[in-house]
């Protein structure tokens, strides 16, 4: 058995990864049909996917030779997954990335690909984050919505201080990147065709703007992001 498929070898009495995913999607569908609220259903589904990802991590973790933390970023970080959303991950190593770490990354990602997920993944060494990646606005904004999934809590705490701490050099570049991406999207989706048939996700005032507002509040007023209501 190859290491990338070891995660799906369920112990006796446990569900396979495919069964876990199928059950998560079925439960999401039930919640939507019962009209329990889209935001809550998305959060519940995201938590179920968390458990699946954590299981894959647990099977792969012995491959890494240096401490590693796994983070959810972007929409997955906000727990806004829909049934067929991609999942955005940051694989953050506390030390050098060598052959063992590359094997770990493969062992983590291959089972997700095999399940049909579109995985957006960023691999970083903690020392690389001493400066904000100002040439990568999408990454800056995605990291603004990061949360810890599993792995080395110490690596995550150092990351959190670097990126979200009171003296972080990431905050202002991230705010600027957020404004730039919003303006670019508004220019595109404010065209006449979208006035006739608005895009409920991308258009001005639509779902991406709600997410942008929450991200902005989290960046500029830490601890108050939950005061901005989620959509339902």
Named regions from a protein language model:
Residues 1-232:
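A nucleotide- and high-energy phosphate-metabolite-utilizing enzyme signature
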């Amino acid at each position: 058995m190859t290491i990338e498929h070891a995660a799906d070898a369920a112990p006796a009495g446990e569900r396979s990864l495919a069964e876990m995913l199928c059950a998560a999607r079925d439960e999401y569908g039930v919640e939507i049909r019962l009209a329990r609220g889209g935001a809550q259903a998305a959060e519940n589904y995201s938590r179920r996917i968390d458990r699946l990802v954590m299981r894959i991590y647990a099977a792969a973790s012995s491959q890494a030779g240096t401490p590693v933390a796994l983070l959810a970023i972007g929409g997955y970080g906000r727990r806004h997954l829909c049934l067929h959303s991609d999942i955005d991950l940051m694989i953050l190593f506390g030390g050098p990335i060598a052959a063992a770490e590359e094997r770990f990354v493969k062992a983590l990602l291959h089972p997700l690909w095999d399940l049909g997920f579109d995985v957006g993944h960023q691999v970083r060494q903690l020392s690389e984050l001493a400066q904000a990646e100002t040439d990568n606005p999408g990454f800056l904004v995605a990291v603004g919505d990061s949360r810890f999934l599993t792995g080395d809590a110490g690596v995550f705490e150092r990351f959190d201080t670097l990126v979200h701490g009171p003296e972080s050099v990431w905050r202002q570049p991230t705010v600027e990147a957020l404004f730039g991406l919003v303006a670019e999207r508004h220019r595109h989706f404010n065209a006449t065709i979208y006035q006739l048939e608005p895009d409920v996700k991308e258009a001005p005032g639509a779902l991406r703007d709600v997410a942008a507002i929450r991200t902005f509040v989290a960046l500029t007023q830490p601890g108050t992001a939950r005061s901005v209501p989620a959509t339902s």
